[in-house]
Amino acid sequence: MSGRGAGGFPLPPLSPGGGAVAAALGAPPPPAGPGMLPGPALRGPGPAGGVGGPGAAAFRPMGPAGPAAQYQRPGMSPGSRMPMAGLQVGPPAGSPFGTAAPLRPGMPPTMMDPFRKRLLVPQAQPPMPAQRRGLKRRKMADKVLPQRIRELVPESQAYMDLLAFERKLDQTIARKRMEIQEAIKKPLTQKRKLRIYISNTFSPSKAEGDTAGTTGTPGGTPAGDKVASWELRVEGKLLDDPSKQKRKFSSFFKSLVIELDKELYGPDNHLVEWHRMPTTQETDGFQVKRPGDLNVKCTLLLMLDHQPPQYKLDPRLARLLGVHTQTRAAIMQALWLYIKHNQLQDGHEREYINCNRYFRQIFSCGRLRFSEIPMKLAGLLQHPDPIVINHVISVDPNDQKKTACYDIDVEVDDPLKAQMSNFLASTTNQQEIASLDVKIHETIESINQLKTQRDFMLSFSTDPQDFIQEWLRSQRRDLKIITDVIGNPEEERRAAFYHQPWAQEAVGRHIFAKVQQRRQELEQVLGIRLT
């Protein structure tokens, strides 16, 4: 006989064997109702030639029956259908599988089974390729071989020893790197000796065409004669400088002032000044040329260029702290040590300083806040004293000692500072280490994959039957997760679960799917289209 399935498409005629399948499942025939096809006792041979025998089972009604007449598989939502594996035909008439639309007009809308509701967790956006590579690197961050591999390959212990040594080495390098970063923030200087050379040359006056030359005075020189003049040179260099790069002499100073005799050169022409500007170009020395044939007393005022800047303390505060000229940070540190040593910090209000008699004389107050100290200290700081050198410019041709040398202390950058900066800025070693880490991670991942394959093959060779059964069970669980058909494993393991009415429909659908599959295969082989 022929009938219709739950989806509204025609079912194939049942053969006597098909009835035997339904009877074997133990499904009793449903009671007759509206829209139900007559049983075998009420019908004869159908037009399709199918014969309904005693073993043939009738299908449930497909007409507009009430909700009570619909059989529902446990664990499936109303209106949902069983997926049929291998069914490649077009969608049957009616609603598609898995939709919430009613199967027939007039049927109530389907609702999801509350036991199968799941929390809809919003999925994150798929990572970009760069982010995906970063996640992969983070997943492979553990370079330790698993214990099972170490037991399988005893030689891998050498790799683990190297890994432990590398971890200690990385910790040591990281600690030293942090120490270098902290040290490079502070001024790293060395005290060196700078030797200053002060020399002068004298050019006597000469008449035109006269090779002998005569000495004259500025007032009595003829108009055509060459005026007598002298030239003063100030140069210098570092003593025992190990660096190959020579530093310019002017780079040590902020300003240089040469004060000549005011009685000889007047109040407007007796000063020669040089001050550092942002656009100043460094030079190896200074030279001054003036007319004159008399000895000149001059004073050189050299202001050192301290980096960071240094300041001279008020004499009262300098005697109290024992600091004469220092940087602002060093002065603040010395001041705090004095406050801490003399217990001047207020015991209750810690942000206040109780001034002793010396502080009251210097800061002119009996109590001040910590935040007020920099402002109070600014009025007590002065520019450091310049280096004063007195020199006599000699114009006597018989005086052989015309060069004077003076040694002064200067601060220069520690050569280690440049090396530390280059070490921190260098990325060559880091790139090489990163590339080697990637290779190690890839090797460890390959070893883990090979170990998994070995376990797979070893389990199969040990007990093929149990292995295949366990593998099928695992694949079955994965298939349920992929197809979103979870069901109830506890019910499915019992025989009564398969004696329910929905099993008849499942068998019919399976047979129909197989028939359609065979039909397509036959059409492909014969190259015809059966109608």
From Swiss-Prot:
SUPFAM superfamilies (UniProt xref): SWIB/MDM2 domain
GO cellular component, one term: nucleoplasm
Molecular function GO terms recorded: transcription coregulator activity
Disulphides: none
Classification via InterPro entries: SMARCD2_SWIB_dom, SWIB_domain, SWIB_MDM2_dom_sf, SWIB_MDM2_domain
The keyword Membrane belongs to this UniProt entry's keyword annotation: no
Residue(s) carrying Asymmetric dimethylarginine: R81, R104
Positions bearing Phosphoserine: S203
Chain positions with Phosphothreonine modification: T217
One GO term (biological process): chromatin organization
Region (Disordered): 205-227
Keywords for the protein's UniProt record, in alphabetical order: Chromatin regulator, Isopeptide bond, Methylation, Nucleus, Phosphoprotein, Transcription, Transcription regulation, Ubl conjugation
Pfam family name, one: SWIB
Residue intervals of the SWIB/MDM2 domain: 306-383
Top-level taxon of origin: Eukaryota
Subcellular location: Nucleus
Family matches, as PROSITE patterns: SWIB_MDM2 (PS51925)
Cross-link (Glycyl lysine isopeptide (Lys-Gly) (interchain with G-Cter in SUMO2)): K226
Function summary: Involved in transcriptional activation and repression of select genes by chromatin remodeling (alteration of DNA-nucleosome topology). Component of SWI/SNF chromatin remodeling complexes that carry out key enzymatic activities, changing chromatin structure by altering DNA-histone contacts within a nucleosome in an ATP-dependent manner. Critical regulator of myeloid differentiation, controlling granulocytopoiesis and the expression of genes involved in neutrophil granule formation.
PANTHER family: SWI/SNF-RELATED MATRIX-ASSOCIATED ACTIN-DEPENDENT REGULATOR OF CHROMATIN SUBFAMILY D
Family classification: Belongs to the SMARCD family.
Subunit structure: Component of the multiprotein chromatin-remodeling complexes SWI/SNF: SWI/SNF-A (BAF), SWI/SNF-B (PBAF) and related complexes. The canonical complex contains a catalytic subunit (either SMARCA4/BRG1/BAF190A or SMARCA2/BRM/BAF190B), and at least SMARCE1, ACTL6A/BAF53, SMARCC1/BAF155, SMARCC2/BAF170, and SMARCB1/SNF5/BAF47. Other subunits specific to each of the complexes may also be present permitting several possible combinations developmentally and tissue specific.
Protein name as it appears in the record: SWI/SNF-related matrix-associated actin-dependent regulator of chromatin subfamily D member 2
Organism: Bos taurus (Bovine)
